[in-house]
Amino acid sequence: MVQRLTYRRRLSYNTASNKTRLSRTPGNRIVYLYTKKTGKSPKSACGICPGRLRGIRAVRPQVLMRLSKTKKHVSRAYGGSMCAKCVRDRIKRAFLIEEQKIVVKVLKAQAQTQKSK
């Protein structure tokens, strides 16, 4: 005859926090083992990229708090909050803006010298 299984905790409904898996004990009994909820790795802070960040552990918030810093970020500018593609774009944009400022300054200086002559 098949062995009947009962939950080990008081909650008797099939909810997200009450998920179980079967496990065979050394005494050859089959019992329920409660599974932990799976975590998700963070999304990019830019809000444009659809995927999740690579190189960061996908764990629940309580576990994330206990992890060391090396497991919560990657060693790059904005590592752990922005994806590499967005960081690359941001650096390029900042460089081009700075270049544009320099060009404007040079043009102003040339116009000033033209005026003084």
From Swiss-Prot:
<dbReference type="GO" id="GO:0022625">
    <property type="term" value="C:cytosolic large ribosomal subunit"/>
</dbReference>
<protein>
    <recommendedName>
        <fullName>Large ribosomal subunit protein eL34</fullName>
    </recommendedName>
</protein>
<dbReference type="Pfam" id="PF01199">
    <property type="entry name" value="Ribosomal_L34e"/>
</dbReference>
<comment type="subunit">
    <text>Component of the large ribosomal subunit.</text>
</comment>
<dbReference type="InterPro" id="IPR008195">
    <property type="entry name" value="Ribosomal_eL34"/>
</dbReference>
<dbReference type="GO" id="GO:0005783">
    <property type="term" value="C:endoplasmic reticulum"/>
</dbReference>
<keyword id="KW-0256">Endoplasmic reticulum</keyword>
<comment type="similarity">
    <text>Belongs to the eukaryotic ribosomal protein eL34 family.</text>
</comment>
<dbReference type="GO" id="GO:0006412">
    <property type="term" value="P:translation"/>
</dbReference>
<dbReference type="InterPro" id="IPR038562">
    <property type="entry name" value="Ribosomal_eL34_C_sf"/>
</dbReference>
<comment type="function">
    <text>Component of the large ribosomal subunit. The ribosome is a large ribonucleoprotein complex responsible for the synthesis of proteins in the cell.</text>
</comment>
<keyword id="KW-0689">Ribosomal protein</keyword>
<keyword id="KW-0963">Cytoplasm</keyword>
<dbReference type="InterPro" id="IPR018065">
    <property type="entry name" value="Ribosomal_eL34_CS"/>
</dbReference>
<keyword id="KW-0687">Ribonucleoprotein</keyword>
<dbReference type="GO" id="GO:0003735">
    <property type="term" value="F:structural constituent of ribosome"/>
</dbReference>
